[in-house]
């Protein structure tokens, strides 16, 4: 069965049938980085500690895709925090919280070996951030 699609159209032609496709609208996101009450940026500190510049580039490229609206391989890890997987050895992760559908707050990063403690730290950061925002 031959299937073809024309760019910019929302229909696929499957032999003699026309099938309508419901495309999801991609929503660009504003990325912000969490700053602790004492002025530290945990994500920037982690990123600058990486010795592999290729890893830094891969992580920044992954965040660029998030800016364009593509969360890709990500999942909730609970308490409002999500994990964004970066497809690069040794299994880098970026942890974030999200406000609505357009604002992403980058909390911290890590890799597979430190995943459990990174998730705990990200949850602490998210909780502190929400409390600080609600107090204002």
What annotation goes with each model-predicted range?
Residues 1-90, 100-104, 111-136:
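Basic, Lys/Arg-enriched alpha-helical interface segments
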């Amino acid at each position: 069965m031959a299937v073809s699609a024309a760019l910019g159209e929302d229909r696929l032609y499957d032999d003699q049938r026309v099938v309508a496709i419901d495309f999801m609208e991609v929503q660009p996101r504003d990325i912000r980085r969490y700053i602790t009450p004492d002025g530290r940026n945990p994500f920037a500190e982690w990123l600058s500690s990486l010795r592999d510049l290729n890893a830094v580039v891969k992580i920044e490229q992954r965040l660029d895709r998030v800016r364009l609206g593509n969360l890709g391989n990500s999942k909730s890890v609970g308490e409002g925090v999500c994990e964004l997987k970066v497809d690069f050895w040794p299994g880098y992760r970026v942890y974030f919280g999200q406000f609505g559908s357009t604002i992403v707050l980058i909390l911290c990063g890590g890799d597979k070996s430190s995943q459990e403690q990174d998730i705990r730290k990200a949850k602490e950061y998210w909780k502190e951030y929400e409390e600080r925002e609600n107090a204002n």
